[in-house]
C-alpha cells in the first residue's frame, strides 16, 4: 500500500514541478501519462517485493493497487495545482453580463451567452455590467473588452487590470436594479464593472472579452464572446 501511495505522489509531484513548468497551457498529457503509468504498477511490485509475496497477489489485489494509485495521484495533483501552491484556473466572469433596468424594455432573457432585449420603443439606453472573478486575486486580472456592431468596433470598454477601472467599478456599485438581480456578481470578492453603452438601435451587438493573469506555472487566459440582441417587439402606432 505504501509503495503505491509513494508512487502516486511521486508522479503527481513530477508532473507538477518537472512537466508543467515547460508547458504554456493544459494538455491531455497531464492526464494521459498517469493513466498509462497504471500499467507499471504490477511490474514495479514484482521487482521490489520478493516473489514469495508478490505471487500471492490476486487480480483483486492488483485492481485495488491501481485504484489507490489513481486516487493518490489525483489527490496530490489537486493539492499541488491549486492555491496556495499553484494557480492553473483562468479568471472568468461571475455571472456573464447584465443590463440595468430602464424604460422601454419589455422583457429580457439570458441564455447560452446571448442577452436578448425586447423593446416597446425604437431605441434603448443600455448600461451593461459584469463581474470579474478569480480564485486568487480578481483585482490583478488584466481585462480587454470591446463592443462590436456588424463586425466593426464601436467602443473599447476595458484595457488594463480590473482594479484600475475605478470609474467602471463605481458605476457598477451605484446600480441596484440589475435586471438579473445579484447574479451578475454575487460574491464580495468579485470585481464589478459597468459601462454606459449609450443609445442602441435594434440589432445584434457582440461583446468580446479577454482576461489574463500570471498564474503558476503558466499564464491563465479566458476568451469570451457574448451577444446582445435587441429587437422591437411592439408595433408603435
Where are these regions (language model features)?
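Short beta-strand elements
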Residues: 95-96, 130-133, 190, 196-197, ...
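Aromatic sugar-binding surface patches on proteins
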Residues: 170-194
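Short, compositionally biased P/S/T/A/G/V-rich stretches that sit at domain boundaries
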Residues: 85-122, 160-162, 236-237
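Contiguous beta-strand segments within globular domains
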Residues: 112-147
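Surface-exposed, short loops/turns at beta-strand junctions within beta-sandwich domains
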Residues: 197-204
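Short alpha-helical packing/oligomerization segments
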Residues: 18-44
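Membrane-associated alpha-helix detector
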Residues: 1-23
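Transmembrane alpha-helices and immediately adjacent membrane-cytoplasm interface residues
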Residues: 46-57, 68-89
